[in-house]
Amino acid sequence: LSNMTNILRQRLKSGQSLDDILPDALATAREAVFRVHHIFAYKVQLIGAIVAHEGDFAEMCTGEGKTLVVVLVSYLNALLQRGVHIVTVNEYLVQRDAKFCAESLNPLGITVGYNLSNFDANQKRKMFACDITYTTNSELGFDYLRDNMVSRYEDKVIPELNYAIVDEADSVLIDEARTPLIISGQPKQDLSMFVEVDDFVKTLGKSDYKIDPESNGI
Protein backbone atom coordinates (compact mmCIF):
# COMPACT_ATOMS: atom_id res chain seq x y z
CA LEU A 1 0.00 0.00 0.00
CA SER A 2 2.84 2.40 0.81
CA ASN A 3 3.97 2.34 -2.84
CA MET A 4 0.57 3.32 -4.22
CA THR A 5 1.36 7.04 -4.04
CA ASN A 6 4.34 6.60 -6.37
CA ILE A 7 2.29 4.42 -8.71
CA LEU A 8 -0.55 6.95 -8.90
CA ARG A 9 1.84 9.86 -9.45
CA GLN A 10 3.50 7.97 -12.29
CA ARG A 11 0.09 7.54 -13.88
CA LEU A 12 -0.43 11.30 -13.66
CA LYS A 13 2.97 11.91 -15.26
CA SER A 14 2.04 9.53 -18.08
CA GLY A 15 -0.88 11.77 -19.00
CA GLN A 16 -3.79 10.49 -16.93
CA SER A 17 -5.96 12.97 -15.04
CA LEU A 18 -7.11 13.02 -11.42
CA ASP A 19 -10.49 11.80 -12.61
CA ASP A 20 -8.80 8.80 -14.23
CA ILE A 21 -7.06 7.74 -11.03
CA LEU A 22 -9.89 8.80 -8.67
CA PRO A 23 -11.22 5.26 -7.91
CA ASP A 24 -7.78 3.88 -7.07
CA ALA A 25 -6.77 6.99 -5.10
CA LEU A 26 -9.89 6.97 -2.93
CA ALA A 27 -9.55 3.23 -2.39
CA THR A 28 -5.94 3.71 -1.29
CA ALA A 29 -6.81 6.50 1.15
CA ARG A 30 -9.78 4.54 2.50
CA GLU A 31 -7.61 1.51 3.21
CA ALA A 32 -4.91 3.68 4.83
CA VAL A 33 -7.45 5.27 7.19
CA PHE A 34 -8.87 1.87 8.05
CA ARG A 35 -5.47 0.38 8.87
CA VAL A 36 -4.58 3.25 11.21
CA HIS A 37 -7.89 4.27 12.78
CA HIS A 38 -10.07 1.22 12.08
CA ILE A 39 -12.64 3.53 10.47
CA PHE A 40 -14.09 2.35 7.16
CA ALA A 41 -15.36 4.97 4.71
CA TYR A 42 -18.86 4.19 3.49
CA LYS A 43 -20.62 5.31 0.32
CA VAL A 44 -21.75 8.61 1.83
CA GLN A 45 -18.13 9.59 2.57
CA LEU A 46 -16.93 8.48 -0.86
CA ILE A 47 -19.70 10.46 -2.56
CA GLY A 48 -18.82 13.48 -0.41
CA ALA A 49 -15.18 13.21 -1.48
CA ILE A 50 -16.16 13.07 -5.16
CA VAL A 51 -18.46 16.08 -4.79
CA ALA A 52 -15.72 18.09 -3.06
CA HIS A 53 -13.18 17.08 -5.70
CA GLU A 54 -15.47 18.40 -8.43
CA GLY A 55 -15.61 21.80 -6.71
CA ASP A 56 -19.19 21.58 -5.49
CA PHE A 57 -20.75 22.10 -2.07
CA ALA A 58 -21.39 18.98 0.00
CA GLU A 59 -23.87 19.35 2.86
CA MET A 60 -23.19 16.75 5.53
CA CYS A 61 -24.83 16.37 8.92
CA THR A 62 -22.95 15.95 12.17
CA GLY A 63 -21.65 12.40 12.41
CA GLU A 64 -21.56 11.73 8.67
CA GLY A 65 -17.78 11.89 8.63
CA LYS A 66 -16.65 15.25 7.24
CA THR A 67 -13.18 14.76 8.68
CA LEU A 68 -12.87 11.47 6.81
CA VAL A 69 -14.20 12.98 3.58
CA VAL A 70 -11.54 15.69 3.76
CA VAL A 71 -8.77 13.10 4.16
CA LEU A 72 -9.99 11.15 1.12
CA VAL A 73 -10.28 14.10 -1.26
CA SER A 74 -7.08 15.69 0.09
CA TYR A 75 -5.08 12.59 -0.75
CA LEU A 76 -6.38 12.58 -4.31
CA ASN A 77 -5.46 16.21 -4.94
CA ALA A 78 -2.16 15.98 -3.04
CA LEU A 79 -0.95 13.57 -5.70
CA LEU A 80 -0.37 16.57 -7.98
CA GLN A 81 2.27 17.87 -5.52
CA ARG A 82 1.00 21.43 -5.86
CA GLY A 83 -0.39 21.85 -2.35
CA VAL A 84 -3.80 21.30 -0.77
CA HIS A 85 -5.21 23.73 1.80
CA ILE A 86 -7.87 22.66 4.29
CA VAL A 87 -9.63 25.77 5.59
CA THR A 88 -11.59 25.58 8.83
CA VAL A 89 -12.95 27.96 11.44
CA ASN A 90 -10.65 27.69 14.47
CA GLU A 91 -7.18 26.55 15.48
CA TYR A 92 -8.43 23.71 17.66
CA LEU A 93 -9.98 22.02 14.61
CA VAL A 94 -6.87 22.83 12.58
CA GLN A 95 -4.63 20.89 14.96
CA ARG A 96 -7.10 18.08 15.67
CA ASP A 97 -7.91 17.33 12.04
CA ALA A 98 -4.30 17.73 10.90
CA LYS A 99 -3.27 15.08 13.44
CA PHE A 100 -5.92 12.65 12.15
CA CYS A 101 -4.92 13.30 8.54
CA ALA A 102 -1.19 12.96 9.22
CA GLU A 103 -1.66 9.66 11.04
CA SER A 104 -3.69 8.38 8.09
CA LEU A 105 -1.63 9.60 5.15
CA ASN A 106 1.97 9.77 6.40
CA PRO A 107 2.31 6.00 5.77
CA LEU A 108 1.47 6.74 2.13
CA GLY A 109 4.30 9.26 1.88
CA ILE A 110 2.04 12.33 2.13
CA THR A 111 3.23 15.19 4.34
CA VAL A 112 0.68 17.09 6.44
CA GLY A 113 1.18 20.44 8.19
CA TYR A 114 -0.89 23.02 10.01
CA ASN A 115 -0.74 26.81 10.13
CA LEU A 116 -1.22 28.77 13.36
CA SER A 117 -1.33 32.51 14.03
CA ASN A 118 1.67 32.41 16.39
CA PHE A 119 3.99 30.80 13.83
CA ASP A 120 6.79 32.92 12.39
CA ALA A 121 7.43 33.16 8.66
CA ASN A 122 9.90 30.26 8.60
CA GLN A 123 7.48 27.96 10.41
CA LYS A 124 4.65 28.96 8.08
CA ARG A 125 6.84 28.41 5.02
CA LYS A 126 7.67 24.90 6.26
CA MET A 127 4.01 24.07 6.89
CA PHE A 128 2.82 25.37 3.51
CA ALA A 129 5.53 23.31 1.82
CA CYS A 130 3.70 20.15 2.93
CA ASP A 131 1.44 18.24 0.57
CA ILE A 132 -1.57 19.12 2.75
CA THR A 133 -1.86 22.14 5.07
CA TYR A 134 -4.63 22.82 7.57
CA THR A 135 -5.33 26.47 8.39
CA THR A 136 -8.03 28.84 9.57
CA ASN A 137 -9.67 31.06 6.98
CA SER A 138 -8.51 34.26 8.69
CA GLU A 139 -4.88 33.18 8.99
CA LEU A 140 -4.79 32.04 5.37
CA GLY A 141 -6.21 35.41 4.36
CA PHE A 142 -3.64 37.35 6.38
CA ASP A 143 -0.79 35.21 5.05
CA TYR A 144 -1.98 35.92 1.51
CA LEU A 145 -2.09 39.67 2.22
CA ARG A 146 1.37 39.62 3.78
CA ASP A 147 2.71 37.65 0.81
CA ASN A 148 1.56 40.47 -1.46
CA MET A 149 3.54 42.99 0.59
CA VAL A 150 6.95 41.28 0.48
CA SER A 151 9.69 42.69 -1.72
CA ARG A 152 11.26 39.31 -2.54
CA TYR A 153 9.48 36.24 -3.89
CA GLU A 154 11.39 33.92 -1.57
CA ASP A 155 9.94 35.75 1.44
CA LYS A 156 6.46 34.47 0.63
CA VAL A 157 5.06 31.72 2.86
CA ILE A 158 2.42 30.31 0.47
CA PRO A 159 4.11 28.78 -2.59
CA GLU A 160 0.97 28.26 -4.66
CA LEU A 161 -2.82 28.46 -4.48
CA ASN A 162 -3.88 25.23 -6.14
CA TYR A 163 -6.75 23.50 -4.35
CA ALA A 164 -8.66 24.24 -1.14
CA ILE A 165 -11.43 22.58 0.83
CA VAL A 166 -13.50 24.93 2.99
CA ASP A 167 -15.06 23.39 6.09
CA GLU A 168 -18.18 25.15 7.41
CA ALA A 169 -18.37 26.95 4.07
CA ASP A 170 -21.52 28.89 4.97
CA SER A 171 -19.81 30.40 8.01
CA VAL A 172 -16.51 31.12 6.25
CA LEU A 173 -17.82 32.40 2.92
CA ILE A 174 -20.91 34.27 4.15
CA ASP A 175 -20.92 35.09 7.87
CA GLU A 176 -17.23 35.78 8.42
CA ALA A 177 -16.81 37.30 4.96
CA ARG A 178 -18.55 40.41 6.29
CA THR A 179 -15.48 41.16 8.40
CA PRO A 180 -12.66 42.51 6.22
CA LEU A 181 -9.06 41.42 6.74
CA ILE A 182 -6.95 44.55 7.22
CA ILE A 183 -3.20 44.81 7.74
CA SER A 184 -2.01 48.15 9.07
CA GLY A 185 1.38 49.43 10.10
CA GLN A 186 3.62 52.46 10.30
CA PRO A 187 4.13 54.09 6.89
CA LYS A 188 7.62 53.91 5.49
CA GLN A 189 9.14 57.41 5.41
CA ASP A 190 12.44 59.22 5.76
CA LEU A 191 12.87 60.12 9.44
CA SER A 192 15.96 62.28 8.94
CA MET A 193 13.79 65.40 8.51
CA PHE A 194 12.35 64.97 12.00
CA VAL A 195 15.86 64.77 13.46
CA GLU A 196 16.81 68.02 11.72
CA VAL A 197 13.65 69.77 12.93
CA ASP A 198 14.27 68.56 16.48
CA ASP A 199 17.83 69.89 16.38
CA PHE A 200 16.56 73.25 15.10
CA VAL A 201 13.83 73.58 17.76
CA LYS A 202 16.37 72.99 20.51
CA THR A 203 18.23 76.17 19.41
CA LEU A 204 15.18 78.41 19.86
CA GLY A 205 14.70 80.74 22.80
CA LYS A 206 11.46 82.19 24.19
CA SER A 207 12.02 85.40 22.23
CA ASP A 208 12.07 83.48 18.96
CA TYR A 209 8.37 82.53 18.96
CA LYS A 210 4.95 83.48 20.32
CA ILE A 211 2.13 81.18 21.43
CA ASP A 212 -1.50 82.08 20.73
CA PRO A 213 -3.43 80.72 23.75
CA GLU A 214 -6.78 80.79 21.96
CA SER A 215 -5.78 78.63 19.02
CA ASN A 216 -2.85 77.01 20.77
CA GLY A 217 -0.86 77.91 17.68
CA ILE A 218 2.71 79.10 17.35
Predicted segments, located by residue:
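Conserved P-loop NTPase motor core
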Residues: 1-218
